[in-house]
């Protein structure tokens, strides 16, 4: 998708806020705890390269989802450790090895395929993933883990880390969390090795279970000023939202009562109204179910009326405004704010998904 840099619609990212959020979390963790910043999915829509460069003096390393995301960081000059959290097909391991990118080992089947590779990958750095109750990837039996370690030593891979992922660290009920923590400790008790990093804490665990961290945490959406729990658990400290989404009015008109607006002619003006058009739509991540949400114009809430189109929305204004008038879809204008969480509430999802839905067509402006 081509970035629309000649359009007034853009995402603005406050990199200083991200750096300050990082420090805010770290001050609440035990001394000597290290952190990998999670910059997968283009840093949750905020811009992976820019975020990684900003955090290069704070983070011990970075987590990504796949090899291509890791390559993007390496090509941008990021030399920190990079851990791929997903499973990398073994045929691509030589690329990871060449660029010193750490991969996740999650099954004996994968290891057998790695053994069959006709390539010397000695020194490849790996992290062993344990499935303690998340149910996605990872070793579930101690015997399988021990066998995996033996194979890794035979292949002369460097076992840099062992980790798991909690499924319910952001919820009120903690029985499943405690069960996962107990299972993880049982695995650790029989480890015949001492990896550099042992990690289980995502953002939620680092925030609400700081006493259970090991020597490394993985900080994700909290860095971007988002609450991992949505509205379920309150944050024990303040963070700054790092992303705002703005555009401009490109067309404005006064319509008489009974005028229809948008596809399906679903909106009918009830009186003489000022209607403005803003160049953003569902192709940018403004999904159609956000119809009826308000945006901010001159510090005033203005409702999105009519169906959201692929590239445009229409909003109802309190009065006439000139072309070029700023429109805030996420962020602050005057004393009013529209948050990512408000979008999530409107469409029945989580704040993570909202920022990840914002497409690459939207230019990221770093401030």
From Swiss-Prot:
**Pfam families (alphabetical):** Ala_racemase_C, Ala_racemase_N
The residues that hold substrate are: 136, 310
> What CDD domains does UniProt report for this protein, alphabetically?
PLPDE_III_AR (cd00430)
According to its UniProt entry, the protein's GO biological process terms are: D-alanine biosynthetic process; peptidoglycan biosynthetic process
Q: Which cofactor does it need?
A: pyridoxal 5'-phosphate
Its EC number is 5.1.1.1
For this record, the Gene Ontology CC terms, alphabetical, are: cytosol
> Which of the seven top EC classes does this enzyme belong to?
isomerase
Which InterPro entries does the annotation name? Ala_racemase, Ala_racemase/Decarboxylase_C, Ala_racemase_C, Ala_racemase_N, Ala_racemase_pyridoxalP-BS, PLP-binding_barrel
Query: Hey, which pathway is this one from?
Result: Amino-acid biosynthesis; D-alanine biosynthesis; D-alanine from L-alanine: step 1/1
Keyword line = Isomerase, Pyridoxal phosphate
Q: Which residues carry this modification: N6-(pyridoxal phosphate)lysine?
A: 40
- State what this protein does: Catalyzes the interconversion of L-alanine and D-alanine. May also act on other amino acids.
Name of this chain's protein: Alanine racemase
Q: What organism is listed for this UniProt entry? A: Streptococcus suis (strain 05ZYH33)
